[in-house]
Design a protein with these regions (language model features):
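Cytoplasmic/organellar membrane-interface segments at the starts of transmembrane helices
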Residues: 264-266, 407-408, 456, 460, ...
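Helix-to-loop transition at the C-terminal end of transmembrane segments
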Residues: 54-64, 190-195, 507-512
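Hydrophobic alpha-helical transmembrane segments of polytopic
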Residues: 12-19, 36-50, 86-93, 117-124, ...
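Membrane-interfacial helical/loop segments at transmembrane boundaries in membrane proteins
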Residues: 65-74, 197-224, 296-305, 513-544
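Hydrophobic transmembrane alpha-helices and their helix-loop junctions in integral membrane proteins
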Residues: 99-108, 125-138, 152-468
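Transmembrane helix-loop-helix hairpins at membrane boundaries of multipass inner-membrane proteins
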Residues: 1-15, 22-119, 200, 515-525, ...
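Hydrophobic alpha-helical membrane-insertion segments
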Residues: 42-55, 175-188, 269, 273-278, ...
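Short phosphate-coordinating micro-motif centered on Lys-Gly-acidic
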Residues: 145
Length: 544
């Protein structure tokens, strides 16, 4: 990797972390609020540019990019390995964080502690990109902790509010238990497979090990199999998926989310619901499909391990179905606009889990496309709701009555996001739901399509309650002086609203050019993921 640009790609999370740590020091010297805000926006802009470069290189080169820290090759050193799957998700993270950073300037106007807000925001972005880019399961643990700790701090940003502190503590307690369980899974993985490198774990779980050999000093390097590995591998995967289901807020590990997300500032709620829960989704997908070859079960080295992976896929479908139905029902009885939207997140994570559990190309395409569509639409929904809350000073749906009449841009943005998430055409949410609907039928699970239809109907009714209240219901307060926000909040709304439409109308092209290649890299072309990691080792040691 001689291209300097590729080195910048590998250093993206460390660069963003450095920017985050430098901000409190800068704020000691520079007292200007606008400079601190500008620093936060520029920091997120740098991260977005680097994520765009990563996306471009992986799709242009069409093979994974491997970056070695300190020139230590895998499996000895920690590496970042970026294929089209995590590069695409990294692009979404970069864009949404940048828009949220701009939006936050006006939303938090007059609030103290803005330097800590942007420090934590940049830290969370660095952690999230680190989770996506890492090729090491222990480094994934570290980056999960970075992401989680910054999220706890941002949930507690309104530190004078009892609700925020209580929600942050609850979130931290549950998150700590989840990461501890994941650490136990890591101990099983390392004790059994003797490595923490994702590519080498993927190599050691496959029966096609003779295909993946690399000549190192005349000897072949390949996996050594013992029957105990099947039991250890299945146990490690089960523990890891349980931990990731907490991070993703998948039923029954969803209980922390409805308290944590509403308590945070609205731009942070957009990040938490739109992006942060997808960290768990990504980890589930990477473990299940890259490390344990769920889409190509015949590749697994042991029948018992295949059976365990199949059982876990069924569990994903069951839990996803329950998430969608339970969250859809709970949406309908909420009176707090942010709490209602938070339950919507649990419902959509359920859809994504169903797609992942199908282990078919179409199911995975539906899951990935819905992951992206939900990130965009949910960010828009929370940011639009945040404008209403910012103006009205309340999250009560009843007290927002009539505000939409004098805030047309905000209301239209909210409607676009709501209709997208409810699955109405021509918006992006409709397309990914239709893909999931078709995938269920192709898999012979047509009765489960009723879950999509019924839960979507619940969601549409819940969103209609908000739309009716803010647009058609008589105002309960004077609306004199109430209007749409300035460009700092309006531009992010407009961009996300346009994306909801474009991702819907241009879906055939996007699926063909972006989604399908990403799924191939994740689940069907794991040989390249393995080869690229070991090519680094071979080149350093004078290999092949």
């Amino acid at each position: 990797m001689n291209d300097p640009i590729l080195h910048l790609i590998g250093l993206t999370p460390p660069i963003v972390v450095a920017l985050a740590f430098a901000l409190p020091l800068l704020s000691l010297v520079v007292k200007s609020r606008s400079i601190v805000e500008g620093y936060g926006v520029v920091g997120s802009l740098i991260a977005m540019i680097l994520s765009v470069l990563t996306f471009y290189y992986t799709y242009f080169i069409k093979s994974p990019i491997v970056y070695t820290f300190g020139a230590w090759p895998p499996p000895i050193g920690i590496v970042y390995e970026v294929d089209r799957f995590n590069a695409l998700l990294g692009l979404v993270v970069g864009v949404v964080f940048f828009l949220v950073a701009i939006y936050s300037i006006e939303y938090l106007e007059g609030r103290e502690g803005i330097e800590w807000y942007y420090t934590l925001l940049l830290g969370m972005e660095a952690g999230m990109l680190g989770v996506l880019y890492t090729g090491d399961v222990f480094n994934l643990f570290v980056m999960l902790e970075v992401t989680s700790v910054t999220a706890y701090g941002l949930v507690a940003f309104y530190r004078s509010r009892k609700e925020s502190i209580e929600a942050a503590l609850k979130y931290a307690l549950v998150g700590s238990v989840a990461t501890t369980i994941y650490f136990i899974a890591l101990a099983l993985i390392y004790g059994s497979y003797g490595t923490l490198n994702m590519a080498q774990i993927a190599l050691k779980t496959t029966s096609s090990v003779d295909y993946f050999f690399f000549i190192l000093g005349g000897d072949k390097l390949w996996a050594v199999y013992t029957p105990a590995l099947a039991v250890a591998g299945a146990a490690a995967l089960a523990l890891a998926l349980w931990a990731f289901s907490v991070k993703a807020a998948l039923f029954p590990n969803h209980f922390w989310l409805p308290d944590a997300h509403p308590a945070a500032p609205s731009p942070i709620s957009a990040i938490l619901s739109g992006l942060l829960v997808k960290v768990g989704v990504y980890a589930i997908a990477r473990f299940t499909y890259t490390l344990f070859h769920a889409a190509q079960l015949s590749m697994l080295i042991d029948v018992a391990l295949r059976n365990a992976v199949e059982a876990l896929l069924i569990i994903l479908i069951v839990l996803g179905s329950l998430s969608a139905l339970v969250a859809g029902l709970l949406m309908m009885v909420q009176t707090d606009i942010k709490r209602l939207i938070a339950y919507s997140t649990i419902m959509h994570i359920g859809y994504i889990a169903i797609g992942l559990g199908l282990a078919t190309k179409l199911g995975l395409e539906a899951a990935l496309y819905h992951t992206i569509n939900h990130a965009v639409a949910k960010a828009l929904l929370f940011l639009a709701a945040g404008v209403f809350i910012h103006v009205a000073g309340t999250r009560s749906i009843d007290e927002l009555s009539g505000m939409g009449r004098v805030m047309p841009l905000t209301t239209i943005s909210f409607v676009i996001a709501a209709f997208s998430l409810a699955g109405l055409p021509p918006f992006n949410g409709f397309v990914s739901k239709y893909l999931l609907y078709t995938a269920l039928i192709d898999k012979g699970l047509a009765p489960l399509t009723l879950i999509i239809v019924i839960s979507s109907a619940f969601a549409l009714l819940a969103y209609s309650k908000i739309i009716y209240g803010v647009w058609l219901k008589a105002p309960t307060r004077s609306l004199e002086g109430v209007h749409d926000p300035t460009w700092k909040m309006s531009v992010p709304l407009l961009i996300l609203a346009i994306l909801c439409v474009v991702l819907g109308l241009a879906s055939p092209y996007i699926i063909e050019k972006l989604i399908t290649p990403a799924i191939i890299d994740l689940a069907y072309n794991t040989s390249d993921y393995i080869k690229e990691a070991f090519n680094i080792l071979a080149s350093i040691l004078g290999g092949r």
